[in-house]
Amino acid sequence: MGYPPPTRRLGDKKRYHYSNNPNRRHPSAVYSKNSFPKSSNNGFVSSPTADNSTNPSVTPSTASVPLPTAAPGSTFGIEAPRPSRYDPSSVSRPSSSSYSSTRKIGSRYNPDVERSSSTTSSTPESMNTSTITHTNTDIGNSRYSRKTMSRYNPQSTSSTNVTHFPSALSNAPPFYVANGSSRRPRSMDDYSPDVTNKLETNNVSSVNNNSPHSYYSRSNKWRSIGTPSRPPFDNHVGNMTTTSNTNSIHQREPFWKANSTTILKSTHSQSSPSLHTKKFHDANKLDKPEASVKVETPSKDETKAISYHDNNFPPRKSVSKPNAPLEPDNIKVGEEDALGKKEVHKSGREIAKEHPTPVKMKEHDELEARAKKVSKINIDGKQDEIWTTAKTVASAVEVSKESQKELTRSVERKESPEIRDYERAYDPKALKTDVTKLTVDNDNKSYEEPLEKVEGCIFPLPKAETRLWELKNQKRNKIISEQKYLLKKAIRNFSEYPFYAQNKLIHQQATGLILTKIISKIKKEEHLKKINLKHDYFDLQKKYEKECEILTKLSENLRKEEIENKRKEHELMEQKRREEGIETEKEKSLRHPSSSSSSRRRNRADFVDDAEMENVLLQIDPNYKHYQAAATIPPLILDPIRKHSYKFCDVNNLVTDKKLWASRILKDASDNFTDHEHSLFLEGYLIHPKKFGKISHYMGGLRSPEECVLHYYRTKKTVNYKQLLIDKNKKRKMSAAAKRRKRKERSNDEEVEVDESKEESTNTIEKEEKSENNAEENVQPVLVQGSEVKGDPLGTPEKVENMIEQRGEEFAGELENAERVNDLKRAHDEVGEESNKSSVIETNNGVQIMDPKGAVQNGYYPEETKELDFSLENALQRKKHKSAPEHKTSYWSVRESQLFPELLKEFGSQWSLISEKLGTKSTTMVRNYYQRNAARNGWKLLVDETDLKRDGTSSESVQQSQILIQPERPNINAYSNIPPQQRPALGYFVGQPTHGHNTSISSIDGSIRPFGPDFHRDTFSKISAPLTTLPPPRLPSIQFPRSEMAEPTVTDLRNRPLDHIDTLADAASSVTNNQNFSNERNAIDIGRKSTTISNLLNNSDRSMKSSFQSASRHEAQLEDTPSMNNIVVQEIKPNITTPRSSSISALLNPVNGNGQSNPDGRPLLPFQHAISQGTPTFPLPAPRTSPISRAPPKFNFSNDPLAALAAVASAPDAMSSFLSKKENNN
């Protein structure tokens, strides 16, 4: 409650009024000494005196009009403009004296005069329910009297009127004052809807703007230009009791009726009237008699029960006639009064809930029509008899209370259960759920009818997809049924909201400046924070750069030291190599340019496309790795509002229905997996135990991982999953053990066969020795390509043919079964191992055949025997390695990398031995590791040196050692006494030997062809021998041992190596026809795996050592048995990958001092001269008694197979030139 504003301002002229009431026409009761109360109405309603309160006959001249109230504490000076008192056209022109019959208590200089005790506080509701009547008293025709028509009292004496006072501003609502008085509020307190008005209960005098204490009567015209406009008080104007106007002079049409545009009032109407372009006002234009009546007010409880008008909606006006007497003809008016009062007591919110916004204009039109209808009632003759009893007021209050209760029940908001469920409950008793009372709703409902046609079969769907389909398939009516705030007419623009213009104006005039200051302060702090962070960052960056410079310098120094140490170490190694006389790879490449050519065999795994290489390099890039692994750091939150004012309400796991979640106890126990799904689950579980995500993926997404988990635990007791896993592992172990057992049994069977073959081979050798004693002594040596002894002896060609066919079938079968081939290889290796245990094999003629060890001791080491020895050792090592397998890994440790060069020095290119020494690397891993790092580390030199020391293998042959080549076979002289019928065919250019020991091979008839009919006939005896029919050509890639020396087959002829170049020369010289020689030579399959070509072109110097006798120990025995010198027998040894020497250089680059000669001492004939000779013979070169010094070859075609093929193609012309050079060198 605020105090009234000062009664006048500085510069205002002091108004004159009668303080002591000298005029007898004015009742003395009006000028009592009671002061203005300290209320929000600022004394606008005067309190009656004690006399007036008790004397009903005293009637004031005017009725007091209740005025609107304002909020306390508001200022008065700038709130509303005041019209000038000197403006004659102003209807609210002030006067210098009061023209009312009664005057308010107190004066404008003493407004705080004590009020009478009969004053009670009143609200707008109490004003509506209370009836205020006045008695018309004749007080004379003074200009100050209301009865007199004057400039101070423009109303006539015979009628009452309602004066319409428009607002000074065009958009301000008008107000109405009874009896033509320009009633205007004194301060902002009059506008507040929150402050109640005081209502006089007894005889009340009227107050208008022309009263002495009225502030607007003293207002100046310049105040109308004030910036803040007067707030509306139309809500209270409707509560004023007015009279109908019969004088048309000052009557104006209401503003709400004249203006056709309507805008809803906002909640802030009391602060800014300019926000509204239209106000709705109601005025019950009823005649107000001036007869004095007795007024009774309701009790305090009744007053409190009356609802309060809301400021947001127009009030409902009372259309009753409170001054009408209770007569039969006025009952209708009383009923309308009761209805009007009932409506008045409804609050604004209740009215808004009853009637939506679009209906408000209709309500106002109805109110206006009702007011006009009531005003037409003729009550002129009854004005003096109008009176009101307490019964009328009490009944009206009672009706209003009942209507308020009904409205409260009707508009009471019913809270949804969802809202109540969100309240947190902490009582354990309330949280406890009775499991026995749980019920499960049957969710087995069918799918709804699709709104759109479904193409194809999409059902059944998983749970989430099904729910999504249901939501999309809902009709619009069902979707919007629960949308409480959905508007009937959609709002297209934000400015269409009723609060838009109001909030915009408030922001511009009030809140905008405050917000601007606050936001600018926040931005300023944020900017300062950023600057400080930048300074900190720059300081840290400088510090980091300094540390990086220090570390860079340190790493550079360490790098320099490391490079220097490596350079010194490299120099020491180079110096050591020079001292030892080892050539470096670079020096050797300069000496032998042909050796620098790369191998034609390429590893395709080393070649990748550019995109893949870029991807690999990108993955290795540390910057890329860092970028991929780095976390995305969000920016700092510098805004304090975002940093501190943001709040988050976590409703995760909020239980809104405790029975709903508890019902899982009944639902989860049921398993709905089908048999097919269960079988898929079992298969997936056995593959991925307890990895339910992978199991769900294995099932094809039929079930989610969560459902798989539930299914596992539901069926855990019925299905023993652990036992299923154990059984599966047992089966896997049993299958692996069965495979190992079968492999072991196969190897045992092969060992038994090997034992039998050893006994048979011993018997075969004894038979051969016996047959040699019965043979003729003068038998020329022949080349025999024998085989290792195995199986039954073959004495006839039929048996040989049968054996060839059997072996051919075995070859075809073994090519399809690689495992069987490996087993046979192991068996063959065991045969070789057992056969090499005997150091000397004695024949009947006293000839001793030494094993490789004995040959080494005597200074003679046959090449093929030595290779056989190494191959047997390799096979044994492989067998041991397979029997005790170790874990193989492609990772090379530091120890293995350091040990590898030492193993290369020890074993050279024998990868299997190096693999066995390392233990964790296979033969392929060792070979690949050598190929990758040989050029960089200079290992090729080590391998060449080791191979040369071991068997003279050149470095170039290491690269081709991986190609499967048929190895050379040792020449064994054991067939001097074999009968001609039992001698097999020996080669392409060979006939049967018939001459003596020293007879040259040229004496043999050259017409004998290897495939001719006389190929197997003896020249002297002409004894017929059954011809050997050749089987169809086959393509075996592996040679197997044979028990007897059989006749050569196509395979033997194709793969037979020709060991001696001088033998080839003699054979070529014995050919009479060059065309015949070419045809025989073309019969060789050059396209094979270079077996014959290698022997033809790659005959090294060590091929000259083809005898099993040494010059120091067995020269005498050879003289006693001359027939044994020229018989050469070649044995087939196991097919191993031991590197062979390349003899292209020996063919094309003869070594000085290494001439060859026939056994009779004459040199070899040139190639052209040998063509004119007779039958070709094949004498054996004499065994060497001293080691041969080897010089590096001048030309080497071992790394260039195309050059080798070209050399073979030009053999007739090229060989003679090379052999002539060789002869000249001798």
Curated annotation (Swiss-Prot):
GO terms for molecular function: DNA binding. GO terms for cellular component: chromatin; cytosol; histone deacetylase complex; nucleus; Rpd3L-Expanded complex; Set3 complex. Its main location: nucleus. The modification Phosphoserine is found at residues 187, 395, 1037. Residues 884-938 form the HTH myb-type domain. Transmembrane segments: none annotated. Residues 81-103, 116-131, 202-211 have a biased composition (Low complexity). It comes from the Eukaryota. Residues 748-758 have a biased composition (Acidic residues). Residues 668-720 form the SANT domain. The keyword Phosphoprotein applies. Part of the Set3C complex, which is required to repress early/middle sporulation genes during meiosis. Identified in a Set3C complex with SET3, HST1, HOS2, SIF2, CPR1 and HOS4. This is Probable DNA-binding protein SNT1. It comes from Saccharomyces cerevisiae (strain ATCC 204508 / S288c). The gene is SNT1.
